[in-house]
Amino acid sequence: MSEVLVRTNEAPRLRVFQRLGELWRDREILANLARKELRVKYKSSALGVAWSMLNPALYLVVFYVVFTYFLPSGIEDFPVYLLSGLVPWTLFTTGLQGATTSVVGGSNLVPKVAFPHEMLPLAAIRAQLVNFFFQLVVLVAFLLIFGYPLFHRGIVLVPLALAVLLVFVTALGFATSALNVRYRDTGHLVDLALLAWFWSTPIVYPASLVQENLEGAFSLYLLNPVANIVLAFQRGIYGGVSRQALESLPAPGLTWYGMRLLVVGVASLVLLYFSWRLFYRRSGDFAEEL
């Protein structure tokens, strides 16, 4: 009697806790990849990581001149407002862009070295997290030099908002990095999306402006997860500057921002699960497609 072989093309199933254990076991690989990312970025650069601090400083000067002298924003203590939104936004954009191209950029490793491929987008985000802390130093130095209060009740929102931001950018990064292996236009689409995303996020204008002029659409405006995260950063940093600063934000109390972060955090975890599944399913074909 002849035997019949039946082949199945069933995709590998993601077992989250088992995979987390594997990632934790190989965490040194993640650290090495992140260090490599930073070394490559600042290779042959005279200023090195100082560029990560100069970038937000340059943005501050440009936006300050534009929105103070040419298009007055009317925002009290505008430099603090700008930096408190620009620093987390920069982490989001650079983290997502780096994650999107990470697997293609690691094409010399994927076919030759056995390691969890999730390490590539995670390392890209971790490298940008290092830059984020350097930029945070610029913000703290600015606050101290010009005598702005640094510690107040709202500061507790900053680490919470950072945690939610990291989950959200990781969720998006898993999806875009996996898609970019097969569809190389993904990176360009991400860049275009980020341009529109910037102007739909309250960084150079106050969210209260949207709240006052488009009251009916404000709830739709808050469907933007990054807007909620940036608002929490602004409440945690800018909201302690003065009473006038607090009045330019959508709500004075911390509870409103905490609830927004909770909603975005839960949604980001759900998105992370499904984008991770997508990445895991496609990772088996990376070596062939690269």
Roles of regions detected by a PLM:
Residues 1-290:
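Hydrophobic transmembrane alpha-helices and immediately adjacent juxtamembrane helices
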